[in-house]
Amino acid sequence: MKSRLLWCDILRVIATIMVISIHTISVYQYTYIKPLQLLPYSIFGVLNSLNRMAVPAFFMLTGALTLKQTKKPITRKSYTYFIKNIIYRLVIPFIIFSLAVYLLTNQHHWSVTGFLALFLNYPGVQKHMWFMYVIIMIYFFIPFLGRFVQSLSRHELKLLICLIFIFSNILSELFILSKHYHKMVFNEVALPYIIAYTNLVLLGLYFMKYNISPGKRRLIYMLGIISLILLPIIQALTNNVDVAKDLITGRSVLPVFISSAGFIFIKYHFSKVKLSSCVTKVITRLSEISFYTYLIHVTIIDIFYTYLLNHNRLNTWTDQLIWTPTQIVVVFIVSSIIAYLFDKLYRYLTKKSSALITRHQPAKQLGNSS
């Protein structure tokens, strides 16, 4: 059995909770951006910024855990095996959850064409599922990325990451802001968004592979804290929900600093943490099912949010603030339970189907001489 890095599991669980927090708090934050109501917007804005390391952290963990050192060449057999794993672990569950969410949220308008029209187009059946299209696409290139980055020195990898950040994240953000203020610059100049997210994968590898000196860690922490403060302020200055949302993606600037600070903090403060076997087991299990938790959590948020609205629990911003922690906890627990049950069922069915296929294969294919 492969040894696990507990701090990576801790980071993944924290990122999962943060994603739930983002989709819970954002509804309230953007309610007060236009017209701007400073106090409630500031409170929800700061809380939302605190969680902005979540999605970039998922990409960074992908790089940290998959771009491993290997001298083995990429063969047709090895790549086929890798693709089968992607289909089993990512694609099939993604299709199942997308179909389930579609059936739950479109109870009176079911149709195959309706589902395909959503599923085969970005961002998918629900807006948060954009992540799946990007991460699956990146995964197809992971073996090649791994071979490529092995040929780079630490300095070369750092330079590559910085260049992509400049020509993707910075130019993209300048375009977004200039467009909002009708002074358009860098239109269609920035690198495609898929490159920006791939850069987060490379950044995760860099932070995992190389030691970051205490001085540089403090600098990154400072950039993260400054970004936490600046993000809601810049969003408020735009006074536009669409622009505000564009400024918090992993292809903009400030969330990268926030996620880098969070990633490094957890790596260096939790890498030697000692927890009881029971707590470790729970964290590991929550980490293993976090992918399924991510897929279902928005549906649970919508159900609970609708319930609170119907029972007049969210009439004022103070009501919303009071109920926010409860929403996050309830959604995380319910989503995790559903994810756990799905994982058990999915493992059972795939094991049974695999055994059935093996049983019906010719003896020669199984390596038998008879």
Labelled PLM ranges:
Residues 43-56, 119-134, 176-200, 235-261, ...:
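Interfacial loop-to-helix transition and helix-capping segments at the boundaries
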